[in-house]
């Protein structure tokens, strides 16, 4: 089966797995100083699904793996490292993005109206655009995925990265994310996995 013919099945399998991961991690509870937790795989589902449907292909040369969503990237667009302007203008993905409940007042979800820039997303996708020209050329060789779909925030609005969670929170979270990653690798069968971010 060609890559083009297998792509719809690959996208469907990744979509199912991302939905399962979202259900698993959304059932978890996190103690202070974590005050807010959001999951763009839930409230930005349509754009997350559009990303997978359009770009996920089997047997990429590399799976580029980020840790978790940034506040002005995937948290706004549902796309890993989802710098708004690049997702909209280069990838051609745009749509209505919902909002988590509750939403941190200092970290509103504005979706594609967000004017802030995700530095890591600008770097990653800027490199991809410069190196490959078109998203189609990039995604023939690469797939980008985030290990953990959750954004963690303290009451102040400060972002907490997953490794700063308490051990009894981290362990079940990492187990769910590890299980999902193993399945994602099995679905994609990439030549290599590269951590980015």
What is each model feature region?
Residues 1-9:
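Basic/polar N-terminal segments that are highly enriched at the extreme N-terminus
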Residues 8-192:
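A polyanion-binding, active-site-adjacent surface
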